[in-house]
Amino acid sequence: MLEAALDALHTDWKPLIIKILNKYPDIALQLKGEYQKYKGITEIYPPVEKIFSAFSHFNQKDLKVIIIGQDPYHQMGQANGLAFSVEEGVKIPPSLR
């Protein structure tokens, strides 16, 4: 399940994230469990393959600031794994205006 999210990573974050998930397997189990628990009942945003997408845009050495968002995305197709962001062409939700 998390393999799809990791396969999408092509930066130097990938080995670090794999190392962390291997060292702390409860993190991966919790993520997988939440997605499995609600599968077929409701949608969880972002889709599992996008949960690490924030790490696909730059390498570790280029990190300057971390911004963590907490406002939920309510509509399908809005959450893309980046705080305060939607994909191009997606109507901007009220919480981001």
What annotation goes with each model-predicted range?
Residues D7, T11-R97:
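A polyanion-binding, active-site-adjacent surface
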Residues M1-A4:
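GGW-centered surface loops in extracellular recognition modules
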